[in-house]
Regions:
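Extracytoplasmic/secreted envelope proteins and their assembly/folding machinery
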Residues: 1, 5, 9, 25, ...
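Acidic, polar ligand-binding/catalytic clefts
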Residues: 1-52, 192-202
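Bilobed "Venus flytrap"/periplasmic-binding protein-like clamshell domains
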Residues: 2, 16-17, 34-93, 109-110
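Short, Asp-centered acidic motifs that coordinate Mg2+ and/or phosphate
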Residues: 6, 10-11, 102-103, 137
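A ligand-binding cleft/hinge motif common to bilobed small-molecule-binding domains
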Residues: 14-24, 69-74, 97-98, 102-132
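Periplasmic-binding protein-like
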Residues: 33-41, 108, 116-155, 174-199
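Extended ligand-binding regions for polar small-molecule ligands
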Residues: 51, 56-57, 62-64, 112, ...
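Ligand-binding clefts/hinges and TM-proximal coupling segments of bilobed small-molecule sensing domains
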Residues: 65-83, 122-123, 155-204
């Protein structure tokens, strides 16, 4: 944010969450992606949703919002989960794969990426009602409404024309070179709603 404010760059467009706290310091474009915090677990197993985690070992990546959320869920709902904090997403997946945990909690798009890299991606499912949702947007300076309008209009045109859905299918539902990994990640209802009605609302 300081680099944006001092003019080092004019806008940033990656996986930056648009939230109320950040809106105090920066403006955000229309949302480009919506993620939900869900679970990766063995296909056909006993875990279908968060309630099934009672008394079970669950892995989460250390230092993430998902880690905070999982501890909160465990305390508030008295679920007696054994929470394992792994150093990165790859380590979290290895903990799941080895059977030391029954589920891995994280943003659904990141879970799809880890599943795609697995030896047998078809053995794993992303399940559960999203415990939180985050909107990713391009971040720009607060004092430039004309620039924001240009970015928003461009995003809205791509989303409402059907072009964004084509891009989504290409990158999330088909093999990606050079390793030909396929994320097999479906367009969520939140994303479908976003493409119909582009907006810059924070979800948290």
């Amino acid at each position: 944010i300081p680099l944006l404010q001092n003019g080092t760059f004019d806008f940033e467009c990656g996986s930056t969450t648009n939230n109320l706290e950040r809106q105090k310091q920066a403006a955000f474009s229309d949302t480009i992606f919506v993620v939900g915090t869900r679970l990766l677990t063995k296909k056909g197993g006993e875990i279908k949703d968060f309630a099934d985690l009672k008394g079970k070992a669950v892995v989460v990546t250390s230092g993430t919002t998902s880690e905070v959320l999982l501890h909160k869920l465990n305390d508030e709902k008295k679920m007696d989960m054994r929470i394992i904090s792994a150093k990165d997403h790859g380590d979290s997946f290895r903990t799941l794969e080895s059977g030391r945990a029954v589920a891995f909690m994280m943003d659904d798009a990141l879970l799809a990426g880890e599943r795609a890299k697995a030896k047998k991606p078809d053995n794993w499912d992303i399940v559960g009602t999203a415990q939180s949702k985050e909107a990713y947007g391009c971040m720009l300076r607060k004092d430039d409404p004309q620039f924001k309008k240009l970015i928003d209009d461009t995003i809205a045109q791509v989303q409402t024309s059907g072009e964004a859905e084509k891009w989504f299918d290409k990158w999330f539902k088909n093999p990606i070179p050079p390793k030909n990994l396929n994320m097999n990640f479906e367009l969520s209802d939140d994303m479908k709603a976003l493409f119909k009605s582009p907006n810059d609302k924070a979800l948290n």
